[in-house]
């Protein structure tokens, strides 16, 4: 669960 990675989508 990486919120940073999700925000980079």
Curated annotation (Swiss-Prot):
It comes from the Eukaryota. One of its GO terms (biological process) is neuropeptide signaling pathway. It is found in: Secreted. Keywords: Neuropeptide, Secreted. GO terms for cellular component: extracellular region. Transmembrane segments: none annotated. Belongs to the FARP (FMRF amide related peptide) family. FMRFamides and FMRFamide-like peptides are neuropeptides. This is Extended FMRFamide-2. It comes from Pachyphasma brandbergense.
């Amino acid at each position: 669960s990486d919120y940073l990675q999700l925000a980079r989508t």
